[in-house]
Amino acid sequence: MIRKMSKNVVVIGTQWGDEGKGKIVDWLAESVQGVVRFQGGHNAGHTLWINGKKTILRLIPSGIMHDGVTCFIGNGVVLSPEALLREIEELEAAGLDVRSRLQVSEICTLILPYHVAVDKAREARKGEGKIGTTGRGIGPAYEDKVARRALRVQDLFNPALFDEKLAEVLDYHNFVLTQYLGAEPVSANEVRDQAMALAPALAPMVRDVSSNLFALQQEGKNLLFEGAQGALLDVDHGTYPFVTSSNCVAGAASAGAGVGPQALQYVLGITKAYTTRVGSGPFPTELVDEIGARLATIGKEFGSVTGRPRRCGWLDGAALKRSVRLNGISGLCITKLDVLDGLETIQLGVGYRVNGEFRDVLPYGAHAVAQAQAVLEELPGWTESTVGITEYSKLPVNARRYLERVAEVCGVPIDLVSTGPDRNKTIVLRHPFKG
């Protein structure tokens, strides 16, 4: 039973990822004692700007930038030991204390070289039909987890068990690689040697994360649960099959960190003022004209990990409504509002025409979404700059009207507005921890 009152917040992307979660988690980390990653892998990067300096985090929670905040990688994350240790070294080179403040769940599924080999070979074989994976082994690792053949972090410290499980799983993957995908097999000895070489560096950080999070709650400590990607990429609720391999809705925080659902009191939905998507998949409000190119250029829309250009379009309020319902969102944070500065008019997606009928929420499945024609509502733009504004009343009138219409369409209030990449360029209408 929890002895003291703590407040725990889940931060979720409401679109197809790249909404600006990293900056907001970094800003909110000032109010917490722990930050938790609960799903995904090193396929998605969070970009932070601290005093004008760019930092990209792929696995380690954004709270690592704050002294006194403990960071946790929960069991729902698929973990590449090599990628994690490389990221730690990069942060240490920048002067950050990482290892004493990072805990890794002992039951995280491992990403190993054969997962990467399978991922890349599959995409190469699909050609034009590819989904757009980052090729980092995320999907194949989750497949092993669900098929109950995965190696986990705790197996690194039991070499005999590691060898036994590796032989079984590699027999399967090498058959797929050679007989179906036409690729080269992966050497068991090379996988084992690499894993065993990395294990000692990982060992001091391996913990029972679920129990430690429970202990922090008993002490009344505030926790922040940091989602990766976005709700429309969720393996169940996204535009399937053009999705990621994990559940990235707010409910996944409970299972992916090992905490009870009653521990999650507030869900903050991060929403870009327009919409972007990386890779393949339907995108009803996509702009393939000069306005789309303008959004991409001004918004610097390139993936932080892959460098891939992002497709851009108007904010899809009906897709946002789906995310609001899926996640039980308490309030929204609108990011990159300044990218819309200078547009004479702005369009907002309020629904779709599907087979001649109006629908006010995103349909399920890629085929249905591809058939949906966006219904757009035109709003007046603004000429004034919104960059760096920290008071809502000082926003241009039409910018405020745009935000109010977004809130009306999706049915939840806007609690935060980001007006620039630095953490202090934020308008606070209701603080998730203090409001």
UniProtKB/Swiss-Prot annotation:
GO terms for molecular function: adenylosuccinate synthase activity; GTP binding; magnesium ion binding. IMP binds at D18, E19, G20, K21, N43, A44, G45, H46, T134, R148, Q229, T244, R308. Its cofactor is Mg(2+). Mg(2+) binds at D18, G45. Signal peptide: none annotated. Homodimer. The keyword tRNA processing does not apply. Its EC number is 6.3.4.4. Gene3D superfamilies: Adenylosuccinate Synthetase, subunit A, domain 1, Adenylosuccinate Synthetase, subunit A, domain 2, Adenylosuccinate Synthetase, subunit A, domain 3. Pathway: Purine metabolism; AMP biosynthesis via de novo pathway; AMP from IMP: step 1/2. Keywords: Cytoplasm, GTP-binding, Ligase, Magnesium, Metal-binding, Nucleotide-binding, Purine biosynthesis. The keyword Ligase applies. SUPFAM superfamilies: P-loop containing nucleoside triphosphate hydrolases (SSF52540). The gene is purA. This is Adenylosuccinate synthetase. Plays an important role in the de novo pathway of purine nucleotide biosynthesis. Catalyzes the first committed step in the biosynthesis of AMP from IMP. Pfam families: Adenylsucc_synt.
